[in-house]
Amino acid sequence: MLKAKNVSKTYNAGKKIALQDFSIEVPTGSVYGLLGPNGAGKTSFIRIINQITQADTGEIFINGEKLNPNHIKDIGYMPEERGLYKNMTVGDQLLYFGELKGMSKNHALEQAKYWFDQLEIDHWWKKKLSELSKGMAQKIQF
């Protein structure tokens, strides 16, 4: 279960309020969406959960535990903006992502090869990211 209590986040030295006393409970096994206009704080909240940025105030709990770095491995996040390096090969990009997640290069290689085999996309390994469609690039981020 995800529980957020009175989460607030500001930018520009407090001049821009992204979230103000935001609270939500998401029961285990459920699917929720965050809806709202631009600037409503949806992305800020997702980034706080993923520990990309920190809340100014409030608390977040995952299964009753205060949010901590150990939760990162259990949280998925695919940002709308692309975090891909177009001149890298698909394989190199995935190894880089694995290292960002704390995996050894060998373990990242093993996992990437496993999933390439499962998804039958072995032929993508040496392709440049710039050669992929937006949809295919999104799969690489996943």
Regions found by a protein language model. Name each.
Residues 50:
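Helix-to-loop junction immediately C-terminal to a conserved catalytic motif
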Residues 58-73:
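Conserved ABC transporter NBD signature motif
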Residues 95, 99, 107-124:
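Conserved ABC ATPase "signature" region
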Residues 33, 47, 137-142:
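ABC ATPase nucleotide-binding domain "signature" region
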Residues 37-41:
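Walker A (P-loop) phosphate-binding loop of ABC-type ATPase nucleotide-binding domains
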